[in-house]
Swiss-Prot record:
Belongs to the complex I 20 kDa subunit family. InterPro entries: NADH_UbQ_OxRdtase-like_20kDa (IPR006137), NADH_UQ_OxRdtase_20Kd_su (IPR006138). The keyword NAD applies. It is a peripheral membrane protein. GO terms for cellular component: chloroplast thylakoid membrane; respiratory chain complex I. This is NAD(P)H-quinone oxidoreductase subunit K, chloroplastic. Its EC number is 7.1.1.-. GO terms for molecular function: 4 iron, 4 sulfur cluster binding; iron ion binding; NADH dehydrogenase (ubiquinone) activity; quinone binding. NDH is composed of at least 16 different subunits, 5 of which are encoded in the nucleus.
Length: 225
């Protein structure tokens, strides 16, 4: 169903572990399961209900209808959109998270249909309110046409994902430059450069008698002060 192949998903190790990026994983899951928000106001919406049956079985396409716009990827408008319902439609679209897509289903949604000639309260096309990605003409469109529209939307998503990947690869390039380092003394043995860093002798290297004389002189100096 998905015409886009993700090259990073093909990289497998000997233990059959797939290595990929989070963006490719989210895009792959979005292509496999689109969550539509059904916005039906007229008779065209009845044709979408035919997809629920066993003949077309829209579950095999990964469609999971959602009742909240904050959980939806697609808003599917079907039927006549009036001036009174226009603010509600725009508000639902604005509440959807990015990326979001719109499918205009039916002649009444696309152009206003037969109500656009003499009705003062009908919106002449839903694309005057929100951007439309797929137009689905018909009065009403058949369930086969709805499946074809979803398939075309998936191809559109695949193309956008590929273009985004190419853009990211061109923008996020890594450039290297040569730096000149001064080779100093090896620090693995603990012999630091005395000119740069002063290292006091440790107490283990001082003889025990000299150490006692040093302590007694320090203590007497403290008593005098």
């Amino acid at each position: 169903m998905n015409s886009m192949r993700f090259s990073l998903l093909d990289r497998t190790t000997q233990n059959s572990v797939i290595s990929t990026t989070s963006n490719d994983l989210s895009n792959w899951s979005r292509l496999s399961s689109l969550w539509p928000l059904l916005y039906g106001t007229s008779c065209c919406f009845i044709e979408f209900a035919s997809l629920i049956g066993s003949r077309f079985d829209f579950d095999r396409y990964g469609l999971v209808p959602r009742s909240s716009p904050r959980q939806a990827d697609i808003i599917l408008t079907a039927g006549t959109v009036t001036m009174k319902m226009a603010p509600s439609l725009v508000r639902l679209y604005e509440q959807m998270p990015e990326p979001k897509y719109v499918i205009a289903m039916g002649a009444c949604t696309i152009t206003g249909g037969m109500f656009s000639t003499d009705s003062y309260s009908t919106v002449r096309g839903v694309d005057k309110l929100i951007p439309v990605d797929v137009y689905l003409p018909g009065c009403p469109p058949k369930p086969e046409a709805i499946i074809d529209a979803i398939t075309k939307l998936r191809k559109k998503l695949s193309r956008e994902i590929y273009e985004d990947r190419i853009g990211c690869q061109q923008e996020n390039r890594c450039f290297t430059t040569n730096h000149k380092f001064r080779v100093g003394r090896s620090t693995h043995t603990g012999n630091y450069d005395q000119g740069l860093l002063y290292q006091s002798p440790s107490t283990s290297e001082i003889p025990f008698e000299s150490f006692l004389k040093y302590k007694s002189s320090v203590s007497s100096h403290e008593l005098v002060n």
